[in-house]
């Protein structure tokens, strides 16, 4: 599966939105990838996550003990990807604003791969790494369906992307004039 295949799946689900969006990262963009519109279709989700699992197998040497997803956005892709890898899926969730592994225990040194939906700045992956390092897990890699940075983001471990699809994003201070005229919508899940 290549980048165009992934984009075609998003188009098939009407999941590429145009307007003025405040991303989960806090950055602004004229394009939003509404992965919920893809994930509501099990067949499309299965295709993407099967492809992501194949990429993980190609890039990660050795055993994987767990796939870990950051709640909320990483829950569905991490679960479906773990199914294709044949390993358990667990997740981190926010407690007082900080990701924690609350419902699960992992063995010291357990080899884990973090699976996220869409990466822009990599903050959720970095916060997930912190939570896993705190319980002495070995984060061997991270993976995502789409890397919006076009391969530029550094999350601290290898990032395996099913697709790199660079979409320009802006800080509030650097918004183009035409985008600043459009009312902003915040469809992400960071503050939930």
UniProtKB/Swiss-Prot annotation:
Superkingdom of the organism of origin: Bacteria
Biological or metabolic pathway of the protein: Pyrimidine metabolism; UMP biosynthesis via de novo pathway; UMP from orotate: step 1/2
Coiled coil stretches, renumbered: none
CDD domains per record: PRTases_typeI
Annotated catalysed reactions: orotidine 5'-phosphate + diphosphate = orotate + 5-phospho-alpha-D-ribose 1-diphosphate
GO terms classed as biological process: 'de novo' UMP biosynthetic process; pyrimidine nucleobase biosynthetic process
Gene3D superfamilies: 3.40.50.2020
Species lineage: Bacteria, Pseudomonadati, Pseudomonadota, Alphaproteobacteria, Hyphomicrobiales
Ubl conjugation is among the record's keywords: no
Protein name: Orotate phosphoribosyltransferase
Native source species: Bartonella bacilliformis (strain ATCC 35685 / KC583 / Herrer 020/F12,63)
Keywords for the protein's UniProt record, in alphabetical order: Glycosyltransferase, Magnesium, Pyrimidine biosynthesis, Transferase
Known cofactor(s): Mg(2+)
Enzyme Commission number: 2.4.2.10
NCBIfam families, sorted: pyrE_Therm (TIGR01367)
């Amino acid at each position: 599966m290549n980048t165009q295949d992934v984009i075609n799946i998003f188009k098939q689900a009407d999941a590429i939105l145009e307007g003025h969006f405040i991303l989960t990262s806090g950055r602004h963009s004229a394009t939003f990838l509404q992965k919920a519109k893809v994930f509501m279709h099990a067949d499309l989700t299965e295709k993407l996550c099967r492809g992501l699992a194949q990429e993980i197998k190609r890039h990660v040497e050795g055993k994987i003990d767990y796939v870990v997803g950051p709640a909320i956005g990483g829950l569905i892709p991490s679960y479906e990807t773990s199914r294709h890898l044949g390993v358990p899926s667990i997740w981190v969730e926010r407690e007082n604003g900080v990701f924690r592994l609350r419902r699960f225990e992992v063995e010291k040194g357990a080899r884990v791969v973090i699976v996220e939906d869409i990466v822009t700045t990599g903050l959720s992956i970095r916060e997930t790494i912190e939570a896993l390092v705190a319980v002495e897990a070995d984060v061997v890699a991270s993976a995502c369906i789409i890397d919006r940075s076009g391969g530029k983001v550094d999350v601290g471990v290898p990032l395996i992307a099913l697709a790199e699809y660079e979409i320009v994003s802006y800080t509030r201070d650097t918004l183009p004039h035409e985008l600043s005229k459009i009312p902003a919508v915040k469809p992400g899940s960071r503050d939930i």
